[in-house]
Amino acid sequence: MKRDFLKIRKRFIVGCLAAAIAVAQPVSSVFANPHYDRRDTVAEEEFIYSARTSGTESSRKKVNPKAWKKINGVCYNGSGKIIPGAITRGMDVSEWQGNIDWKQVKRSDIDFAFVRISYGLTHEDYTYDENMTNAELAGVPTGTYVYSTALSTTTALKEAQLAISKMQGYKVSYPVVYDLEDAKASKLSAKTVSEMALTFCNEVRRAGYYPMVYCNTNWYDNYIDWSLL
């Protein structure tokens, strides 16, 4: 069976995730550090390029998944430099990674994984159940995420309700993430985007889960009104 573990796109979270969950900080304060830029922690030699075809071929920059190290609780980038403030190491996964060897993930000193539930309301990730089941069997704690395609609070609420229904029966020990990066949503006002995020997070919180908003620094600076969250 082909294993695509080495293709997994990793995201590394700054700060103490467990502590943030325990004190239940407002969603706007958790992992919304404007001074943290993913690019600042990546050495140039860590980047690799991959071809992506959909009629025409284009290349996109990816991070070599073998580049980061965690040694004795300290995180290092590919140049061997300590990443300030980073104390935990994880990844997100979806059907794009294919079949994942979760035992290998566990052996690779991965502290957690976020598993995609869906792409909006139109596409439920077909590897979600397999990933949630096998991650738990391998002893890898999981959170979940929804790649939002919402353009209104009504749709954001439905995305949250879908997430809640899909998590039934699974052990979700890390946050439920609202992934804001869709190009269509970037055309909305910051107020509307923030209201969508708040709607999603409130519904998830009411169901007993801990919500979190994921976005890149561009979205953080330009498309979200954090005073509303």
Residue ranges and their predicted role:
Residues 208-221:
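Aromatic-lined carbohydrate-recognition surfaces of secreted/lumenal glycan-active proteins
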Residues 73-210:
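Substrate-binding cleft of extracellular glycoside hydrolase catalytic domains
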Residues 37-94, 98-103:
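N-terminal carbohydrate-binding accessory modules
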Residues 23-39:
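Sec-dependent signal peptide cleavage junction
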Residues 220-229:
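Substrate-binding cleft/loops of secretory-pathway carbohydrate-active enzymes
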Residues 1-7:
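N-terminal secretory signal peptides that target proteins for export/translocation
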Residues 7-21:
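Sec-dependent N-terminal signal peptides
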